[in-house]
């Protein structure tokens, strides 16, 4: 099925990104014989179409920066792929899809070092700007704590459309594969993420971010919980 044939309300929704489609097709190619691949992909498309018809319509469409590559709608497409192919796809492969969408932008920023005050302040400003965008759309409800020189950056989401979608349609079990990329992205900036909870299994998704040389990191060792989430003590 051509993407243009999908019956979605494009006045409020967007199509999955081309990079997301490429990643999903690569996993389908990995697990299915050639004669089945087109039919499997069409099942993913139809699931995407079906679930968007039951989904909220206030996420801003193309105007909202959260709806780009690796964003809310790509997460929805990845969940639809998981729904169709959960019997063959692995947890690590699901992580790889989101990593391949998100991490290229961070690879370009490897010169950033959050251990240095200049970059730490610049990161804080970026998060503060992101909060203003969130306040415009009220999709991800974001709160950034005041900046303090001697402490890590802290912000949290108390609402996350991807988590909301996962819980509503029964995909909460695969959300760790989509959330764990937050750790990998920070590591490329010489930073460490410390997290204790998410919007899927709690009331917020917390982000405490510091340089990878900060003593704070040793005080909050990382582990994987029974669901696959990367977390900190």
Predicted regions: what they are:
Residues 70-168:
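Amphipathic interaction/junction segments at domain boundaries or subunit interfaces
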Residues 184, 222-233:
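Short, cationic low-complexity segments
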Residues 206-208, 219, 225:
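N-terminal functional module detector in eukaryotic proteins
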Residues 1-82:
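N-terminal, charged low-complexity regulatory/assembly segments
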Residues 162-164, 212-219:
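Short, charged/polar, Gly/Pro-enriched secondary-structure boundary elements
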Residues 196, 202-212:
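C-terminal edge-of-domain segments
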Residues 141-201:
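Short, hydrophobic/π-rich interface segment
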Residues 65-67, 166-169, 224-225:
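A short, structure-level motif marking secondary-structure boundaries and short turns
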């Amino acid at each position: 099925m051509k993407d243009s044939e999908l019956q979605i309300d494009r006045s409020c929704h967007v199509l999955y990104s081309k990079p997301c489609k490429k990643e999903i097709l690569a996993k389908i190619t990995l697990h299915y014989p050639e004669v089945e691949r087109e039919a499997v992909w069409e099942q993913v498309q139809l699931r995407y179409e079906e679930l968007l018809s039951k989904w909220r319509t206030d996420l801003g469409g193309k105007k909202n920066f959260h709806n780009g590559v690796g964003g809310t709608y790509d997460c929805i497409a990845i969940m639809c792929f998981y729904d169709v192919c959960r019997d063959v796809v692995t947890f690590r492969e699901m992580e790889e899809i989101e990593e391949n969408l998100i991490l290229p932008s961070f690879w370009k920023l490897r010169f950033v070092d959050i251990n240095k005050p200049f970059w730490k302040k610049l990161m804080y400003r970026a998060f503060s700007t992101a909060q203003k965008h969130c306040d415009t759309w009220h999709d991800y409800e974001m709160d950034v704590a005041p900046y303090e020189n001697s402490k890590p950056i802290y912000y949290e989401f108390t609402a996350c459309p991807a988590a909301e979608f996962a819980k509503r349609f029964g995909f909460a079990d695969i959300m760790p594969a989509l959330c764990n990329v937050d750790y990998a992205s920070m590591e490329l900036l010489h930073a460490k993420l410390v997290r204790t909870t998410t919007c899927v299994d709690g009331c917020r998704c917390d982000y405490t971010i510091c340089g990878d040389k900060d003593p704070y990191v040793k005080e909050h060792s990382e582990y994987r919980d029974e669901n696959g989430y990367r977390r900190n003590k």
